[in-house]
Amino acid sequence: MRVRPRINRWTEARRNLVFSSSISKSLVQPHFVVSGKDIDEPISGMPGIQRQSIDVLLKTIAEDIKHGLSAHMLFTVVEPEHKDSVASAASDMDMHGIIAVREIKKHFGEQIVLFTDVCLCTATDHGHCGIIVDHQIDNDVTVQRLVEIAIAHA
């Protein structure tokens, strides 16, 4: 399956991200989403950045938009019990990361540009960014898995 989406210029947020001469319009705000409710936990190594549940994340993004930040990068924090060798959680439609994508799109639509992390390392039990076959990372299998994850996130 060939899926090669492009960053198009259909929305103002996308045009600003790609063509703006203003630095603030080109910034991408990182967000780390966790399961649960009312979670707003600071990340010690990243001052000003928190691990947040979806309910808190939606409020944070609304505030970011008020301050002119329209580009957002979503990283899903996967609990150890949901990790496996092929990063199943990364494309599980019932996992908080994908639910967050749906909620963000529903609440903010074309006001924002939303990026998601499709790297396998956060959802694999071995921590590598690829699918391991016979003790080696298999690039072809990994690319196919990344495509599946990207489609789930879209």
Residue spans for each PLM region:
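N-terminal amphipathic/basic leader segments beginning at the initiator methionine
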Residues: M1-F19
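Acidic, His- and aromatic-enriched active-site or binding-groove loops in soluble protein domains
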Residues: G97-K105, H135-V147
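Non-catalytic positions within long, well-ordered alpha-helices that form the structural scaffold/packing
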Residues: A62-K66, A154
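Glycine-rich, proline-tolerant flexible connector loops at the mouths of alpha/beta enzymes
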Residues: D40-Q52, L69-H96, A123
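Alpha-helix-loop-beta-strand connector modules within alpha/beta enzyme cores
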Residues: D84-V118
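Structural preference for beta-strand elements that scaffold enzyme active sites
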Residues: S26-P30, A71-M73, Q111-F115, A152
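N-terminal small/glycine-rich loop or linker at the start of catalytic domains
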Residues: S21-I49, F115-I137
